Amino acid sequence: MMEGNVQEELELEKSVRRFREKFHGKVALETAVVLMRRFANNHNQVCTYVILYMDNDTDLDVRNHLRNDQVAMNVINKIKRDDQRAKEMPKDKDIQDLAKKMNTLPLTQKNLKMFNDAAENRIPARDRQFACKECDYMWWRRVPQRKEVSRCQRCRKKFDPVPDNKMWGIGEYNCQSCKRMFRGYGQIEVSSPCYMCSKPVSPSCILPPRRNQGPRTRNTHSCFAEYCYNRKEPFVPGLQCAHPKSRILNQLPKVLHPSEWHISTGSTIATCLSQGSLNENDIDDIILDDIKEEEDDEETDDSDS
């Protein structure tokens, strides 16, 4: 019985988080919970109803304003095509009130994109790299684009992602001299010699870890870093080698560039896009861990006040 309650709470937690994230946290927590309980955690269905009610409740002035906005009209026309679903909408007061609240929001480009994504049941997200200097620990998370934050699973501190120009790991290289594409350990803005023509090439991107990375390369890593275990000449003093073997041989930390501590604005909406490493941990276990962490945070805030 206890396991059944935990699973029920878990499913409710996931649906509430996803529903609130679709509207960028503008839905009250209590309202989201009531709607998810009422509609059996079907956040996609409730989201569709809200958008449809918004369309039905739009007054004449707003309609005239929208006609001059092609992006907004595309969203509205796409929703209107589903007439059958509109006819089957439940007469739910909470959904109607929420739709009215959403209709009072200014028609900024940001809000229009939010409605467009919500209509398509999308939560735009990116795979980002995070690194904790104190724990010498690096991980990847899939986080909402509008709020890229992750918590270190070791020290529990929250961090912003590693800057795009400082990311490291398995990089994808495109040599302009011999037109060859290859992969290998590296860091953005740090050159490595092409395996074919030996010309220096910087990685175009750093790839997130995946369970199936494809066949491993037979080429031996090399770069121009001073302490690379297979360095090329002329080496560059102070340049760091990203390869794990070089880090171990020179007793260097695993983290090349740490993340900055996240300064909370109080507007972060916890989501379950992937609150765990991309290549480790079960998603349900991580969500349950996040719930416990949030409860601990609330207890800490109460004790401080």
Swiss-Prot record:
Which Gene Ontology terms of cellular component type are present?
A: cytoplasm; nucleus; P-body
Keywords assigned by UniProt, alphabetized:
Cytoplasm, Nucleus, RNA-binding
- Per UniProt, the short sequence motif Nuclear localization signal occupies residue numbers 141-157
Kindly list the biological process annotations in GO that this record carries: innate immune response; negative regulation of translational frameshifting; regulation of translational termination; response to interferon-beta; viral translational frameshifting
Q: Which Pfam families match?
A: UPF0515
Q: Which InterPro entries match?
A: SHFL
Main localization (coarse): cytoplasm
Q: Which GO terms describe its molecular function?
A: ribosome binding; RNA binding; sequence-specific mRNA binding
Where in this protein would one find the motif Nuclear export signal, according to its record? 279-288
According to its UniProt record, where is this protein located? Cytoplasm; Nucleus; Cytoplasm, P-body
The family annotation for this protein states: Belongs to the SHFL family.
Q: Per its database record, what is this protein's job?
A: Inhibits programmed -1 ribosomal frameshifting (-1PRF) of a variety of mRNAs from viruses and cellular genes. Interacts with the -1PRF signal of target mRNA and translating ribosomes and causes premature translation termination at the frameshifting site. May exhibit antiviral activity.
Task: Please state what the protein is called.
Answer: Shiftless antiviral inhibitor of ribosomal frameshifting protein homolog
- The gene designation is shfl
